UniProtKB/Swiss-Prot annotation:
Monomer. Belongs to the DNA polymerase type-Y family. The keyword Membrane does not apply. Residues 4-185 form the UmuC domain. GO terms for molecular function: damaged DNA binding; DNA-directed DNA polymerase activity; magnesium ion binding. One of its GO terms (biological process) is SOS response. Its EC number is 2.7.7.7. Poorly processive, error-prone DNA polymerase involved in untargeted mutagenesis. Copies undamaged DNA at stalled replication forks, which arise in vivo from mismatched or misaligned primer ends. These misaligned primers can be extended by PolIV. Exhibits no 3'-5' exonuclease (proofreading) activity. May be involved in translesional synthesis, in conjunction with the beta clamp from PolIII. Binds 2 magnesium ions per subunit. It comes from Serratia proteamaculans (strain 568). PROSITE patterns: UMUC (PS50173). This is DNA polymerase IV. Its cofactor is Mg(2+).
């Protein structure tokens, strides 16, 4: 049985700013773009969250909820420096580190001899070391499989940890709401609820063939997670090749204006936020759009583009909408980017000789 730790820094960007300027600690603070340029919130501290401010929210909305919100543009160099220090701390315990972004990672400590091999004590020590050396707090989840470790890291935030031992997995899954499983959004959770599926226990008792017929490949993944199956290993060599966001709609849409509003107000801000966590300069190889129609057929279109660009994505989506929809309702809209190959990127950065 593996010992997996998921470490998630607490409001990371804001925490770095509060550490470097203590006067910011007790006031509502957010990192993001300006409201007049349709900016997006990257993260918010806990005083701001009490007003309802959260990541991926438009800055304009955040300022409506909290007019006295302190807004900073962010210092990506400082965040990257702190992130690198944190990864160096991880490496003192295990070489099996899978970074997910600047502020979170999976660690496999199965073969770690420190702390007598106790994953719980290792997580505590890592969090204490981060606090001592960087004056930042982290939360952690400990479990025998990845998706449960990630869920566990959210259960005792901020500056805490939660352990799910192998013996506790069955009971934990029995009462776990499906909405807590990564990949189950609000619309999907609602559709699951429509057929009586609310917790993992419900899925465990549901016919797999019926689940596959109704939900396709996702049904298989959901069934496995509800059985406590997650065969994914912590992969240090994992290279993220793409970043994407998509929304399954509660009702099919038929007007381009509704699609454009979804892209501008919801999807693009979230895509920019996710991309900035793994590629702060927003440099990419390609960007594209995905539409799924009411008959479950889907289509994608990509453009070669050097930097994430909202106007281009809207133009691509408009073209796909006009040329391929054929009068059908649209049930899902997605945006994605393909990242630059690291080797090619390094070659492009080499000076000419």
């Amino acid at each position: 049985m593996r010992k997996i730790i998921h470490v998630d820094m607490d409001c990371f960007f804001a925490a770095v700013e509060m550490r470097d300027d203590p006067s910011l600690r007790d006031i509502p603070l957010a990192i993001g773009g300006s409201a007049d340029r349709r900016g997006v919130i990257s993260t918010a501290n806990y005083p701001a969250r009490r007003y309802g401010v959260h990541s991926a929210m438009s800055t304009a909305m955040a300022l409506k909820l909290c007019p006295h919100l302190k807004l900073l543009p962010g210092r990506m160099a400082a965040y990257k420096e702190a992130s690198q220090h944190i990864r160096e701390i991880f490496a003192r315990y295990t070489p099996l580190i899978e970074p997910l972004s600047l502020d979170e990672a999976y660690l496999d400590v199965t073969d770690c001899s420190q702390c007598n091999g106790s994953a719980t004590l290792i997580a505590e020590q890592i969090r204490q070391t981060i606090s001592d050396e960087l004056n930042l707090t982290a939360s952690a989840g400990i479990a025998p499989i990845k998706f449960l470790a990630k869920i566990a890291s959210e259960l005792n935030k901020p500056n805490g940890q939660y352990v799910i031992t192998p013996a506790q997995v069955p009971a934990f899954l029995q009462q776990l709401p499906l909405s807590k499983i990564p990949g189950v959004g609000k619309v999907t959770a609602k559709r699951l609820e429509e057929v009586g599926l609310i917790t993992c226990a419900d899925v465990q008792q549901y016919d797999l063939a019926a689940l596959l017929k109704r939900f396709g490949k996702f049904g298989r993944v959901l069934w496995e997670r509800c059985q406590g199956i997650d065969l994914r290993e912590v992969s240090p060599e994992r290279l993220r090749k793409s970043v994407g966001v998509e929304r399954t709609l509660a009702e099919d849409i038929h007007d381009w204006e509704d699609c454009e509003a979804l892209i501008v107000d919801k999807l693009y801000p979230e895509l920019e936020l996710r991309l900035r966590k793994v590629k702060p300069d927003l440099h990419i190889a390609r960007q594209g759009v995905k539409l799924k129609f009411q008959d479950f057929q889907q289509t994608t279109q990509e453009h070669v583009w050097p930097v994430l660009n909202k106007d281009d994505l809207i133009n691509v989506a408009r073209q796909v909408w006009r040329e391929r929809r054929e009068g059908r309702g649209v049930r899902l809209v997605g945006l994605h980017v393909t990242l630059l190959d690291p080797q090619l990127e390094r070659q492009l950065l080499l000076p000419w000789e």
